[in-house]
UniProtKB/Swiss-Prot annotation:
Known role: Shows cytolytic activity on many different cells by forming pore in lipid membranes. In vivo, increases heart rate or kills the animal by cardiac arrest. In addition, it binds to heparin with high affinity, interacts with Kv channel-interacting protein 1 (KCNIP1) in a calcium-independent manner, and binds to integrin alpha-V/beta-3 (ITGAV/ITGB3) with moderate affinity.
A Gene Ontology biological process term: killing of cells of another organism
Residues marked Important for cytolytic activity (site): 24, 26
Subunit structure of this chain's protein: Monomer in solution; Homodimer and oligomer in the presence of negatively charged lipids forming a pore with a size ranging between 20 and 30 Angstroms.
Lineage: Eukaryota, Metazoa, Chordata, Craniata, Vertebrata
Disulfide bridge map: 3-21, 14-38, 42-53, 54-59
Major location (coarse): secreted
GO cellular component: extracellular region; membrane; other organism cell membrane
Protein name as annotated: Cytotoxin 1
PROSITE patterns reported in the protein's UniProt record: SNAKE_TOXIN
Subcellular location: Secreted; Target cell membrane
């Protein structure tokens, strides 16, 4: 699986076991992602951040 990084033109191949792409948003500003990459478990959320995930190449 390949996931986008925060810079739109950059992407990376995910290591074994991390087979989801994610975008992390601040809950207070939920329109602009602050981090992107590979993740193993989804969804994750807290009081400050939320994760939006998908499982196809460069879908984040």
């Amino acid at each position: 699986l390949e996931c986008n990084k925060l810079v739109p033109i950059a992407h990376k191949t995910c290591p074994a076991g991390k087979n989801l792409c994610y975008q992390m948003y601040m809950v207070s500003k939920s329109t602009i992602p602050v981090k992107r990459g590979c993740i193993d478990v989804c969804p994750k959320s807290s009081l400050l951040v939320k994760y939006v995930c998908c499982n196809t190449d460069r879908c984040n």
